[in-house]
């Protein structure tokens, strides 16, 4: 598959997945077409003959596969390329692209799973299910299911924290990784703030008994420190020492 084939097919699939036909609310038959001179601005440039030939060869290959239908002028210029919906599954397979319909199914399963965990997730998940029915994107989902489910898992557990807990300890308790929460903190806070009832986004985590990890004091150079009767001589250390 050439880069031109890939680009053409992805543009056509994007149009299809963003349409009413995709969710079955279209009242008329829709077609999904792209103009090559819009996709490749130099396609009709006489000085770019190599590009013209390469694009046309790619289009011919797609026609041969049965993926597209084209309108071509007598001079060889391809006027338009239209997606053949009858072979849409083969197009996905050819591209190695996961159908949006499959992604939607998986997202719905996750949202339904977490919907009844607490009031915040009830509001958030209900809204995202509505957005999916409207063919809109799911807020805070960036095409990574593992990260997304980690976000929802944190939101499901964070309202249950009774005692003051460091972020890293909470991260280990819920996700089994001391640094995992840090990577998704901003999205977790956004969901909590937008779908919960908190007066201040900045203090939201503290209101839920989740506090920042303790800082560290670094010692280096000449000096001595006595702790519990034992003396530490910094001058004998090759590097620095951190105490939390």
Please state what every model-predicted region is.
Residues 1-244:
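Nucleic-acid enzyme cleavage-core boundary/entry regions
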